[in-house]
């Protein structure tokens, strides 16, 4: 069997196609979750914490070079200049994204599992000794 034919058989299997569709939808869905967190949740958290902007929360690990022309309070400006900084605000935002995404996926899986009907178990085959005993019983009844 040629390698191309094997690959074709592999690629058209149901699980591979389902996985591809899932990855594409997941990528699009993560953008929605990013927007929800960045544009809806984080501003509310910022208001509740007194106008705190998490995207600019960082700890400076290095020194700012004298040639730096950006805003020393801007994490993005410091990153662009190559200054070492620990951006914990960005991490908090990503962690919230993850928790929301994981919770939504959990709810989706739970809903799908609820929709699935449990497969009815096939009746167990009657053991051979029971069949033999039934034959003996039936033959005794006929006498």
Swiss-Prot record:
Per its UniProt record, what Pfam families does this chain match? Answer: MscL
Q: Which species is this record about?
A: Burkholderia vietnamiensis (strain G4 / LMG 22486) (Burkholderia cepacia (strain R1808))
Instruction: Supply the alphabetized keyword list.
Output: Cell inner membrane, Cell membrane, Ion channel, Ion transport, Membrane, Transmembrane, Transmembrane helix, Transport
Lineage at the top is: Bacteria, Pseudomonadati, Pseudomonadota, Betaproteobacteria, Burkholderiales
Q: How does it assemble?
A: Homopentamer.
- Gene3D superfamilies linked: Large-conductance mechanosensitive channel, MscL, domain 1
One GO MF term attached to the UniProt entry: mechanosensitive monoatomic ion channel activity
Physiological role: Channel that opens in response to stretch forces in the membrane lipid bilayer. May participate in the regulation of osmotic pressure changes within the cell.
Name under which the protein is recorded: Large-conductance mechanosensitive channel
- The record's principal subcellular location, in a coarse class, is membrane
Q: Where in the cell is it found?
A: Cell inner membrane
Q: Can you quote a single GO CC term? A: plasma membrane
Secretion signal, residue range per the UniProt entry: none
Membrane topology recorded in Swiss-Prot or TrEMBL: Multi-pass membrane protein
Q: Which family does it belong to?
A: Belongs to the MscL family.
Transmembrane feature ranges: 10-30, 89-109
State the HAMAP family in the record: MscL
What SUPFAM superfamilies does the record tag this protein with? Gated mechanosensitive channel
């Amino acid at each position: 069997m040629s390698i191309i034919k094997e690959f074709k058989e592999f690629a058209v299997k149901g699980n591979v196609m389902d996985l591809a569709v899932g990855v594409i939808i997941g990528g699009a869905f993560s953008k929605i979750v990013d927007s929800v967190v960045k544009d809806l949740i984080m501003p509310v958290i910022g208001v509740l914490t007194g106008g705190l902007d998490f995207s600019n929360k960082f700890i400076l690990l290095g020194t700012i070079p004298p040639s730096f022309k950006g805003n020393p309070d801007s994490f993005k400006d410091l990153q662009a200049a190559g200054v070492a900084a620990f951006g914990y605000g960005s991490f908090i935002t990503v962690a919230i994204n993850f928790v929301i995404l994981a919770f939504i996926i959990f709810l989706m899986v739970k809903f799908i599992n609820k929709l699935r009907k449990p497969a009815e178990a096939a009746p167990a085959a009657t053991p051979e000794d029971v069949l033999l005993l039934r034959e003996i019983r039936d033959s005794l009844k006929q006498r």
